[in-house]
Amino acid sequence: MGLRGIVMYATPVCYLFAEPAELYFVYRALYAQYCCRLHTVSSQTGDILQLSRQFECVFQESHPHLYYHLLAIAAPPLKLVFNWIVFAFAGYLEVGQVMALWDRILAWDSLLVVPVAAAAILAFREKRLLECTCADEVHLVLADASTLQVVQLLQLYLFKDRIDALRD
């Protein structure tokens, strides 16, 4: 993983604690329980292979047109979001949004929310992504995450059918 990975995981936690000792113990527990699985290949639930597969299945099933469009322009969806998943969005989303997502990980005691969040972000950017003709354009569309509200995107992605049914 290296120093970059440690820093990526530790930085959001630094906003929560003034005392280094508290920070260390919380970070250690977070890493031991969740983050280490993002760098492990195993048969355990929540390892990086399972999360990658989960992303591909969820995204392909919910947005097949976008999924195949991205493949056609040499921008495989998993390749686009892999670092988001590996670092649980640290370094991509704003710190407050990372903390909101990590709160869901802790609440559900599961990393499965991470690939769903990745699919939700691609789905949210669907219109602009479908206009892209090459991988470089896709990267430009996804580069700015400053306005993303991850909890709202998750809710919209997971409950869109129910929301639409309530409107009818």
Label the model's feature ranges.
Residues 1-168:
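Helix-rich, well-folded core regions that mediate interactions or catalysis
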